[in-house]
Amino acid sequence: MGNRVCCGGSWSCPSTFQKKKKTGSQTRRTLKPQPQQLQQNLPKGHETTGHTYERVLQQQGSQERSPGLMSEDSNLHYADIQVCSRPHAREVKHVHLENATEYATLRFPQATPRYDSKNGTLV
C-alpha cells in the first residue's frame, strides 16, 4: 500500500545506482557513486538514511527552511508533511446532519370547483 520510501532488511528492491548502457550487442551496467562516497561530502553532524535520491538529513532540534534559501545539494528535496486523523463516527454523523438536505411536504387545501353559469366553465 503506497510507495516505500526506503528498502532495507529483507526487502528486495532494485538498486537505484545502476544504469544500463548499450554498447553494440552487449549491455553493460555502470555504477554511480556509492552512498559512502556521497556521505563524505556532507557537513559534520549530519546523518543520512535511505537511497541517495531519497536521503533525509537528521539533525538535533527542529529544522526550518526559509523560502529564499537555495540548497547546495540539488538532490536534496524538502516536503511539507501534514498529519491527519480520521474523524470519529459521532463527528461524521453530526457533520452529515449539519449539511443534510431538508425536505418539507406542502399540503394545499383542495379547491372546490365552482360552476360559472355565465361562461359555462368551472372556476
Swiss-Prot record:
Cytoplasm in keyword set: no
Positions of modified residues (Phosphothreonine): T30
CC annotations in GO: extracellular exosome
The keyword Phosphoprotein is annotated on this UniProt entry: yes
InterPro entries linked to this entry: DUF4578 (IPR028106)
Residues bearing PTM Phosphoserine: S62
Keywords: Phosphoprotein
Ranges of compositional bias, category Basic and acidic residues: 44-54
Coiled coil: none
Pfam families: DUF4578
Region (Disordered): 17-74
Biased composition, class Low complexity, residue ranges: 32-43
Protein's recorded name: Uncharacterized protein C11orf52
Protein source organism: Homo sapiens
Encoding gene, per UniProt annotation: C11orf52
